[in-house]
Regions:
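Zinc-dependent deaminase
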Residues: 1-21, 40, 89-158
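Small-residue (primarily alanine) positions within well-ordered alpha-helices
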Residues: 14, 18-21, 31, 42, ...
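Short, flexible loop/turn motifs enriched in small residues
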Residues: 24-28
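Short beta->alpha transition motifs characteristic of CBS
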Residues: 42-48
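Histidine-centered active-site/metal-ligand motif
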Residues: 45, 57, 128
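A short, polar/charged loop-to-alpha-helix boundary motif
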Residues: 50-61, 65
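Immediate flanking context of iron-sulfur cluster ligation sites
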Residues: 72-84
Length: 158
């Protein structure tokens, strides 16, 4: 039996959210916000295409839902688990929401802002720097994304 890491269950839930994005023909990225005890506060997936919203990234959707659920925009004590390394917008949202920990699956060498292209969350000029855990179930996240983009390329879409 394969040993699992401490973030695997939450990442599997994020992957389920990514599947929901895929079903809506959106880029399959999913996110989960956990409170300090590990309880799920909110989930989200990409809605950029379905809602015609440039800010409809899984991380932003989940952070908004978590803030609404908690009645507080400061998400101190929370962990954001997301299937893909956040972009600059989403990394900025993590910092601004005061999330304690960011856990992500696959690295994004085209848009990643948590170490790949930029490192927004570790920038010492900012007032908050969350802990980062990278590469959790990265192969599963990558396979989902690769399949999506291969289908879109072969169909001549986006």
């Amino acid at each position: 039996m394969r040993r699992t890491g401490p973030w695997d269950d939450a990442m599997r839930l994020a992957l389920t959210e990514a599947q929901a994005a895929l079903a809506a023909d959106d880029v399959p990225v999913g996110a989960v916000v956990l409170d300090a005890s590990g309880t799920v506060v909110a989930t989200g997936h990409n809605t950029r295409e379905s809602r015609h919203d440039p800010t409809g990234h899984a991380e932003v959707v989940a952070l908004r839902a978590a803030a609404a659920a908690r009645g507080e925009w400061r998400l101190s004590g929370c962990t954001l688990v997301v299937t893909l390394e956040p972009c600059t917008m989403c990394a900025g949202a993590v910092v601004l929401a005061r999330v304690d920990r960011l856990v992500f699956g696959a690295y994004d060498d085209k848009l990643g802002a948590v170490g790949s292209l930029w490192d927004v969350v570790r920038d010492r000029r900012l007032n908050h720097r969350p802990e980062v855990v990278a590469g959790v179930l990265a192969d599963e996240s990558t396979a989902l994304l690769d399949g999506f983009f291969a289908r879109h390329r072969s169909a001549g879409l986006r």
